[in-house]
């Protein structure tokens, strides 16, 4: 007996749909041609450029056009971010699905996820993951092993809902927040992920730079870190903590190399200098000076990463990192960026961003094409069986 064609087709459709679902503690955000997948375990972020299609374009237009909301979401780590439009409706059958009126036929978690976009063997894949936090003294030596986080591999982050109609510095973005509490250190770590849907200019302290549609920014925030004070009995070495080293593991097509080409820098960095002065010093009260330009790294495949030279401390006080930071380290073929954060009392904010380049052309079969091919093969087999028995 032959299996009915309807059953075979239904089975294949079920397989395709199952591959599109996220796990409970992952979120996928998707723009016109860039997707980012965020993992609650370790806070890992995977970024790829994907092929555009008609449905994705419509979905992105829906997100960009929804700009009526101006309510400040004070629960967010970033008070500059605006919440989703109040017209959005929640699917009662799938509470995690936050849908807008124009998006009622999306997949279960409203993330347009295609799991085959994110493969570890994809050479064009970019990934970023917190590696460790380490308190160091003025000489860069570790203060106390209790004042460190050796690995984030087993750290669980809580993920917010995906906000498809957010704004950052006046630009349309899709965003999701991660947060966790470090029990041993009694500190909080948050990651705010933004996928830009339109190009524009962003300022971070003294640094101004351009973003594109498809740029992904992920602010990393550390709150309430208790630094050693030298005489504190809680610190066994009695050293004084002066900096907090934040290390981030990365995966990229090529080993990151700093961009020195002036033309490429001009495409990224803006300045506010309207006069032809020779003043290269950025004075706080001198609006005629150039803004600093972030460090630009080429990641291979035309992908670029921007690393700010400073951090925001406490009440949005821009503070430069020590000379030589942020810096690239390579250990046993593992690539890492190290950010040396000056001592703070409340919070510290690091602000890296990345723009993925074009994907390397390769032969790939989508789930829809795979289904059509299997259906065609099944029909041909059925016809062949009919001829054999007749």
From Swiss-Prot:
Q: How does it sit in the membrane?
A: Single-pass membrane protein
Compartment annotation:
Membrane
Region (Disordered) location: 53-121, 254-292
Q: Which GO terms describe its cellular component?
A: membrane
Q: Where is the composition biased (Acidic residues)?
A: 100-121, 272-292
- Extracellular compartment ranges equal 17-368
Q: In which tissues is it expressed?
A: Component of the acid-insoluble and acid-soluble organic matrix of the aragonitic skeleton (at protein level).
Cytoplasmic topological intervals: 390
Q: Which UniProt keywords apply?
A: Membrane, Signal, Transmembrane, Transmembrane helix
Its domain of life reads: Eukaryota
The transmembrane residues are: 369-389
The keyword Membrane belongs to this UniProt entry's keyword annotation: yes
Signal peptide span per the entry?
1-16
Q: Which stretches does UniProt call biased (Basic and acidic residues)?
A: 58-99, 254-271
Its protein name is Skeletal aspartic acid-rich protein 2
Q: Which organism is it from?
A: Acropora millepora (Staghorn coral)
Query: What broad taxonomic lineage does this protein's source fall under?
Result: Eukaryota, Metazoa, Cnidaria, Anthozoa, Hexacorallia
């Amino acid at each position: 007996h032959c299996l009915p064609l309807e059953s075979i087709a239904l089975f294949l459709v079920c397989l395709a749909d199952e591959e599109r679902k996220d796990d409970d503690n992952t979120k996928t955000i998707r723009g016109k041609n860039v997707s980012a997948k965020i993992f609650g375990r370790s806070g890992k972020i995977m970024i790829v450029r994907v092929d555009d299609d008609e449905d994705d374009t419509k979905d992105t237009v829906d997100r960009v056009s929804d700009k009526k909301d101006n309510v400040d979401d004070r629960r967010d780590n970033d008070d500059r971010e605006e919440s989703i439009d109040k017209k959005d409706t929640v699917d009662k059958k799938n509470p995690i699905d936050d849908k807008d009126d124009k998006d009622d036929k999306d997949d279960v978690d409203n993330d347009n996820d295609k799991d085959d976009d994110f493969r570890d063997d994809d050479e064009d894949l970019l990934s970023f993951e917190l590696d460790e936090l380490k308190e160091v003294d003025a000489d860069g030596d570790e203060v106390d092993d209790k004042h460190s986080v050796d690995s984030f591999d087993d750290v669980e982050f809580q993920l917010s809902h995906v906000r498809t109609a957010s704004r950052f510095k006046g630009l349309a973005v899709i965003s999701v927040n991660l947060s966790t509490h470090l029990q041993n250190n009694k500190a909080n770590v948050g990651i705010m992920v933004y996928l830009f849907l339109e190009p524009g200019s962003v300022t971070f302290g003294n640094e101004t730079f351009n973003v594109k549609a498809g740029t992904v920014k992920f602010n990393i925030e550390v709150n309430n870190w208790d630094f050693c004070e030298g005489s504190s009995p809680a610190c066994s070495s009695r050293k004084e903590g002066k900096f907090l080293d934040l290390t981030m593991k990365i995966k990229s097509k090529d080993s990151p190399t700093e961009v020195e080409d002036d033309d490429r820098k001009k495409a990224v960095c803006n300045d506010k200098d309207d006069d032809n002065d020779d003043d290269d010093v950025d004075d706080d009260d001198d609006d005629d000076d150039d803004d600093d330009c972030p460090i630009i790294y080429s990641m291979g495949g035309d992908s670029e990463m921007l690393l700010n030279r400073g951090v925001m401390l406490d009440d949005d006080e821009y503070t430069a990192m020590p000379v030589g930071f942020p810096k690239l380290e390579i250990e046993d073929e593992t690539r890492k960026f190290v950010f040396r954060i000056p001592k703070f009392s409340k919070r510290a904010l690091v602000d890296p961003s990345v723009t993925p380049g074009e994907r390397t052309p390769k032969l790939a079969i989508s789930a829809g094409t795979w289904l059509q091919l299997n259906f065609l093969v099944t029909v041909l087999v059925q016809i062949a069986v009919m001829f054999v028995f007749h």
